[in-house]
Design a protein with these regions (language model features):
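Acidic, metal-coordinating catalytic segment for phosphate/diphosphate chemistry
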Residues: 2-35
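Short Gly/Pro-enriched turn/cap motifs at secondary-structure boundaries
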Residues: 25-28, 101, 124
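Short, well-ordered beta-strand micro-motif
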Residues: 38, 110-114, 133-136
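Conserved Nudix-box catalytic region and its N-terminal flanking loop in Nudix hydrolases
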Residues: 40-79
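Nudix hydrolase/Nudix homology domain
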Residues: 54-55, 127-169
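A short coil-to-beta-strand element that immediately follows conserved catalytic motifs
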Residues: 84-93
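Active-site-adjacent beta-strand/loop module that shapes the phosphate/pyrophosphate-binding cleft
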Residues: 96-121, 154-155
Length: 169
C-alpha cells in the first residue's frame, strides 16, 4: 500500500493544513462601530443627529482598519463633538446582520464615557452632524430607530457594571 492509500482508511487522520492567508480570507468579516453613552447630571442621554441618516445616534462611529473599538470611540468623540473624553467600561455589544445597503454584519460596541456637566463644551463636526441634544432615556431610545434597545441596555449595564449583548440590535 502507498501512503496515499493509508490516508484513505476509515478513521485515518488527514492533514487539513491550509495556508494562513487562504484560511483567514475565508473567515467571517464584519464592520466594527463604537459609540459612547454620555449623560448629563440629570441622567439625560447625549445623542447626535447625522446629516446622512433619518435617526439620531450615540456619538461614535466606524473603526478604522485594525483599530481597537475603544480607540475608535475616543477618536470619533474628538472628531464628532470636539471632546477628548476617557472611554470607560464596555456596556453593550450589539450584532446586526448584513442588509442590502451593508453587505457585511456589524458588531457595535457601546462604552461608558461618563457624565458631562454642560453641553457648552460640545463642538459639532458640521460636515457630518446637524444637531445634538440631551434626552430623557425614553426619548433618546425613540430617536434611535432600529437600534433603540441600546439605550436601556447601556444604562442598565452602567448601573449593574455588567455588559449586555444585544443580537439583532
Amino acid at each position: 500500500m502507498t501512503d496515499d492509500a493509508d490516508d484513505l482508511r476509515p478513521g485515518a487522520v488527514r492533514s487539513t493544513f491550509v495556508e494562513p492567508e487562504i484560511y483567514y480570507a475565508g473567515l467571517a468579516a464584519a464592520y466594527v462601530t463604537a459609540g459612547a453613552l454620555i449623560t448629563d447630571p440629570a441622567g439625560r442621554v447625549l445623542l447626535v443627529k447625522p446629516n446622512y441618516r433619518d435617526h439620531w445616534l450615540l456619538p461614535g462611529g466606524a473603526a478604522d482598519d485594525n483599530e481597537a473599538p475603544e480607540a475608535a470611540c475616543a477618536r470619533e468623540l474628538e472628531e464628532e463633538i470636539g471632546l477628548a473624553l476617557d472611554v470607560g467600561p464596555l456596556l453593550v455589544v450589539a450584532w446586526q446582520p448584513a442588509r442590502a445597503e451593508r453587505f457585511r454584519p456589524t458588531v457595535s460596541f457601546v462604552f461608558d464615557a461618563g457624565i458631562l456637566a454642560g453641553p457648552e463644551r460640545i463642538r459639532l463636526q458640521e460636515d457630518e452632524l446637524d444637531d445634538h441634544g440631551f434626552f430623557a432615556p425614553e426619548q433618546a431610545a425613540a430617536r434611535l430607530g432600529p437600534i433603540a434597545a441600546r439605550i436601556p441596555a447601556a444604562l442598565h449595564a452602567r448601573e449593574t457594571r455588567t455588559p449586555v449583548y444585544l443580537p439583532h440590535a
